[in-house]
Swiss-Prot record:
Encoding gene (name): hisB
Domain of life: Archaea
Name of the protein this chain belongs to: Imidazoleglycerol-phosphate dehydratase
Pathway annotation: Amino-acid biosynthesis; L-histidine biosynthesis; L-histidine from 5-phospho-alpha-D-ribose 1-diphosphate: step 6/9
Keyword Lyase included in the entry's annotation: yes
Amino acid sequence: MPRSAVVERRTKETEVKVELSLEPGEVNVDTPVKFLNHMVETLIFYMGASGRVKAIDLRGFDDHHVVEDVAIVLGSTLDKALGDRTGLARFGWAIIPMDDALTLASVDLGGRVYFMFKGSFTRETVGDMATEMVPHFIRSLASSLRATIHVNVMWGENNHHIAESVFKALGLAIGQAIQVKGGGVPSLKGVL
């Protein structure tokens, strides 16, 4: 099974295209939000995946539409690449330090959508991205990926380090969950 997918989404606000392979390789992210580029590149790299993400902002209001739509399309692309999810590990978790910041992330790819984020930032932005968009990105990703995602920022002082520890931990957790373990459906019910 190829474990790759391409998804495009066009709205009156953005155009987003994501090409994703669940094999390691080159990652290229090009959006008008530079800090988002850094975070999405980090996420895909730590998932052990490769791909290209291209987003165009058609309205230019702020970072909200681009961040949200990239998360939606990335989640949809990953969902498509996973197929029927037979044989997946399904669960993944990581606790990642980034200097002063420490973040726990846990993922369940069982098809039930839920999102929980515990943590806070002391600045309104990191670079050109609003810090409120960090949890919103993850919420949007969880919804389109059909996943349960919990993120707990245990502590941190530097806002860049906090955000980066979130995306690294989430990437590693998703990377574990997408591993093929063999066998059937990863559920006692027999279906996801």
